[in-house]
Protein backbone atom coordinates (compact mmCIF):
# COMPACT_ATOMS: atom_id res chain seq x y z
CA UNK A 1 0.00 0.00 0.00
CA UNK A 2 1.11 3.53 -0.73
CA UNK A 3 2.68 5.37 2.17
CA UNK A 4 4.00 8.41 0.24
CA UNK A 5 2.58 11.30 2.28
CA UNK A 6 4.03 13.80 -0.22
CA UNK A 7 1.88 12.71 -3.15
CA UNK A 8 -0.89 15.15 -3.98
CA UNK A 9 -4.49 14.21 -4.42
CA UNK A 10 -4.24 15.16 -8.11
CA UNK A 11 -1.13 13.01 -8.62
CA UNK A 12 -2.85 10.03 -7.09
CA UNK A 13 -5.99 10.63 -9.15
CA UNK A 14 -3.81 10.83 -12.27
CA UNK A 15 -2.34 7.41 -11.38
CA UNK A 16 -5.85 6.03 -10.99
CA UNK A 17 -6.96 7.59 -14.29
CA UNK A 18 -3.99 6.04 -16.15
CA UNK A 19 -4.85 2.57 -14.83
CA UNK A 20 -8.53 3.09 -15.67
CA UNK A 21 -7.62 4.18 -19.22
CA UNK A 22 -5.47 1.07 -19.66
CA UNK A 23 -8.30 -1.13 -18.38
CA UNK A 24 -10.92 0.53 -20.59
CA UNK A 25 -8.69 0.20 -23.67
CA UNK A 26 -8.23 -3.49 -22.88
CA UNK A 27 -11.99 -4.03 -22.54
CA UNK A 28 -12.84 -1.96 -25.64
CA UNK A 29 -10.57 -4.18 -27.69
CA UNK A 30 -12.49 -7.33 -26.81
CA UNK A 31 -15.00 -8.77 -29.26
CA UNK A 32 -18.47 -9.08 -27.68
CA UNK A 33 -18.18 -12.86 -27.37
CA UNK A 34 -14.98 -12.49 -25.33
CA UNK A 35 -16.49 -9.68 -23.26
CA UNK A 36 -19.19 -12.10 -22.10
CA UNK A 37 -17.06 -15.28 -21.94
CA UNK A 38 -15.94 -16.69 -18.58
CA UNK A 39 -12.29 -16.43 -17.57
CA UNK A 40 -11.26 -17.68 -14.14
CA UNK A 41 -14.91 -17.77 -13.09
CA UNK A 42 -15.68 -14.19 -14.16
CA UNK A 43 -16.25 -12.64 -17.53
CA UNK A 44 -14.64 -9.32 -18.47
CA UNK A 45 -18.22 -7.97 -18.23
CA UNK A 46 -18.34 -9.10 -14.61
CA UNK A 47 -15.02 -7.38 -13.92
CA UNK A 48 -16.37 -4.08 -15.27
CA UNK A 49 -19.47 -4.44 -13.06
CA UNK A 50 -17.25 -5.22 -10.07
CA UNK A 51 -15.20 -2.06 -10.65
CA UNK A 52 -18.32 0.10 -11.03
CA UNK A 53 -19.39 -1.14 -7.60
CA UNK A 54 -16.01 -0.39 -6.07
CA UNK A 55 -16.35 3.30 -6.92
CA UNK A 56 -19.35 3.40 -4.58
CA UNK A 57 -17.80 1.10 -1.96
CA UNK A 58 -14.71 3.32 -1.91
CA UNK A 59 -16.75 6.45 -1.24
CA UNK A 60 -18.73 4.69 1.50
CA UNK A 61 -15.53 3.29 3.02
CA UNK A 62 -13.79 6.66 2.99
CA UNK A 63 -16.77 8.27 4.72
CA UNK A 64 -16.70 5.55 7.37
CA UNK A 65 -12.93 6.00 7.87
CA UNK A 66 -13.29 9.75 8.20
CA UNK A 67 -15.77 9.10 11.04
CA UNK A 68 -13.23 6.78 12.67
CA UNK A 69 -15.12 3.63 11.66
CA UNK A 70 -13.79 0.58 9.90
CA UNK A 71 -15.06 0.44 6.28
CA UNK A 72 -18.00 -1.95 6.19
CA UNK A 73 -16.70 -3.64 3.03
CA UNK A 74 -13.86 -5.10 5.10
CA UNK A 75 -16.34 -7.50 6.69
CA UNK A 76 -16.17 -9.34 3.35
CA UNK A 77 -12.36 -9.42 3.23
CA UNK A 78 -11.92 -13.01 4.41
CA UNK A 79 -13.85 -14.32 1.40
CA UNK A 80 -11.98 -12.00 -1.01
CA UNK A 81 -14.97 -9.64 -1.21
CA UNK A 82 -17.02 -12.30 -3.02
CA UNK A 83 -20.32 -11.19 -1.52
CA UNK A 84 -20.09 -7.49 -2.34
CA UNK A 85 -18.62 -8.26 -5.76
CA UNK A 86 -21.56 -10.56 -6.49
CA UNK A 87 -23.94 -7.73 -5.59
CA UNK A 88 -22.17 -5.45 -8.10
CA UNK A 89 -22.26 -8.09 -10.84
CA UNK A 90 -26.03 -8.45 -10.32
CA UNK A 91 -26.71 -4.73 -9.93
CA UNK A 92 -24.79 -3.68 -13.04
CA UNK A 93 -26.21 -6.47 -15.16
CA UNK A 94 -26.10 -5.04 -18.67
CA UNK A 95 -24.35 -7.16 -21.27
CA UNK A 96 -23.77 -4.11 -23.46
CA UNK A 97 -20.09 -3.23 -23.32
CA UNK A 98 -20.48 0.48 -24.08
CA UNK A 99 -23.31 0.87 -21.57
CA UNK A 100 -21.18 -0.67 -18.81
CA UNK A 101 -18.11 1.39 -19.77
CA UNK A 102 -20.29 4.52 -19.63
CA UNK A 103 -21.48 3.49 -16.15
CA UNK A 104 -17.87 2.90 -15.14
CA UNK A 105 -16.87 6.38 -16.35
CA UNK A 106 -19.80 7.98 -14.52
CA UNK A 107 -19.00 6.12 -11.29
CA UNK A 108 -15.39 7.26 -11.49
CA UNK A 109 -16.41 10.89 -12.00
CA UNK A 110 -18.51 10.73 -8.83
CA UNK A 111 -15.59 9.12 -6.98
CA UNK A 112 -13.10 11.74 -8.19
CA UNK A 113 -15.42 14.61 -7.25
CA UNK A 114 -15.82 13.10 -3.80
CA UNK A 115 -12.07 12.60 -3.36
CA UNK A 116 -11.31 16.17 -4.42
CA UNK A 117 -13.70 17.37 -1.68
CA UNK A 118 -11.66 15.70 1.09
CA UNK A 119 -9.36 18.14 2.88
CA UNK A 120 -5.69 17.43 2.10
CA UNK A 121 -4.87 16.89 5.77
CA UNK A 122 -7.36 14.00 5.87
CA UNK A 123 -5.96 12.31 2.75
CA UNK A 124 -3.20 10.37 4.52
CA UNK A 125 -4.42 10.70 8.09
CA UNK A 126 -5.58 7.74 10.08
CA UNK A 127 -8.29 8.43 12.66
CA UNK A 128 -7.49 5.17 14.44
CA UNK A 129 -8.79 2.84 11.73
CA UNK A 130 -6.66 -0.25 11.39
CA UNK A 131 -7.37 -3.67 9.97
CA UNK A 132 -5.18 -6.75 10.23
CA UNK A 133 -2.34 -4.54 11.40
CA UNK A 134 -2.57 -2.03 8.52
CA UNK A 135 -3.32 1.67 8.86
CA UNK A 136 -6.27 2.40 6.62
CA UNK A 137 -6.37 5.82 4.98
CA UNK A 138 -8.12 7.45 2.05
CA UNK A 139 -4.75 7.54 0.32
CA UNK A 140 -3.96 3.84 0.56
CA UNK A 141 -7.58 2.93 -0.21
CA UNK A 142 -7.27 4.76 -3.54
CA UNK A 143 -3.91 3.15 -4.16
CA UNK A 144 -5.57 -0.22 -3.58
CA UNK A 145 -8.28 0.61 -6.13
CA UNK A 146 -5.60 1.75 -8.58
CA UNK A 147 -3.83 -1.57 -8.12
CA UNK A 148 -7.11 -3.43 -8.67
CA UNK A 149 -7.48 -1.81 -12.10
CA UNK A 150 -3.90 -2.79 -13.00
CA UNK A 151 -4.50 -6.35 -11.74
CA UNK A 152 -7.67 -6.80 -13.77
CA UNK A 153 -6.07 -5.33 -16.90
CA UNK A 154 -3.25 -7.90 -16.65
CA UNK A 155 -5.76 -10.64 -15.90
CA UNK A 156 -7.81 -9.90 -19.03
CA UNK A 157 -4.71 -9.45 -21.21
CA UNK A 158 -3.25 -12.77 -20.04
CA UNK A 159 -6.57 -14.51 -20.63
CA UNK A 160 -6.83 -13.11 -24.17
CA UNK A 161 -3.24 -14.17 -24.88
CA UNK A 162 -4.04 -17.69 -23.69
CA UNK A 163 -6.83 -17.96 -26.29
CA UNK A 164 -4.41 -17.59 -29.18
Regions found by a protein language model. Name each.
Residues 1-21:
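Extreme N-terminal tail/first-helix region
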Residues 83-124:
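Acidic/histidine-rich alpha-helical segments that form the ligand environment
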Residues 10-17, 48, 52, 98-101, ...:
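Short amphipathic alpha-helical segments with heptad-repeat character
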Residues 15-44:
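Long, hydrophobic N-terminal alpha-helical segment
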Residues 1-2, 34-83, 123-164:
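Short, contiguous alpha-helical
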Residues 17-28, 55-63, 105-119, 150-153, ...:
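Structural signal for well-ordered, non-membrane alpha-helices
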Amino acid sequence: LLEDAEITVEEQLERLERRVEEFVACIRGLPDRQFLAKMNGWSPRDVVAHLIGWSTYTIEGCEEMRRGERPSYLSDWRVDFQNINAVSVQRFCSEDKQELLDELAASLEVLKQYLRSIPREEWASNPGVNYLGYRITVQNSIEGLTGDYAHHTRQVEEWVASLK
